[in-house]
Amino acid sequence: MRWIIFSVSLLALVSCGTKVPFTNQMVEDYNLYSEKQMAKVQFYTSQTITLNRVKKVAGSNHASNGVLIENSSNFQDRITIQAQTPGVIEKSGEDGQLYIRFEQGKGKFLSFKVRPNAQNGRYYLDAQFNMNTGGELTYGEERFSVNSAAGQTYLMVIVKKIQKSTSKDRIVRGMKI
């Protein structure tokens, strides 16, 4: 009976984990300096990232039945990476960036890095942000725009705390003369 209770308790402890922001302090604490070590870590996004790209297709102007017709069309490409989407490291950059892949495909990864003035050490989405228009980044070898809220997206990881303790119980019956 004790063995069953111990096994169930251990399973509950092992399967539990808390998602926390990934920081440069974790890199030091868990010795994650190499890409090989970093490849063992499952990353998650803290919030939804929506990439937008609008491509205008050249139109044609012509006259038909006495009416001038302007033909033009737009192609909109929207990619959504939901909050808590799992990703893996693709590579690391010279300036401490982490390139995280959320899907297969050439160049389909996003860059995250620690902000120079941030004291929390979190890895935030790295894009060229403008206060008025949001940001721009490259994804899948295409330029996409992101809204300014995406700049607050950071990487998260699951941390499991396992505390192992053993005990030995025995009952002393006493001694008789």
Describe these PLM feature segments.
Residues 1-5:
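Positively charged n-region of N-terminal signal peptides that target proteins for export
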Residues 12-15:
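C-terminal motif of bacterial Sec signal peptides marking the signal peptidase cleavage site
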Residues 73-117:
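Mid-length scaffold segments of soluble, non-membrane domains
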Residues 17-20:
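Bacterial signal peptide processing site
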Residues 38-40, 82-86, 93-97, 139-141, ...:
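Extracytoplasmic
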